[in-house]
Amino acid sequence: MAEGWLMNPSDKWTYRFHRDEKSWVRDQKVFVDMGRPMPDGSPALLKTRQHLRREDAEKFWKNLLSYGWQRVPAVWGADAEF
């Protein structure tokens, strides 16, 4: 898991899953940020950040997909397409 994005199509809340590079070698952890893109193009509204073990993050990802969340390209940050 390098980085991935999931969005709830009904309300546009989005999860960003990305590695914690500082812990990746010894104890693989993932940051999971929840936010929503702003319609006027201003910075995203970030609500929460979780710090999960890689296995837990993968389970969470699969669970969200089973509830209808969809993979999307980057929604905010340097990789986002505007």
List the predicted regions and their residue ranges.
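Terminus-proximal functional modules
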Residues: 1-82
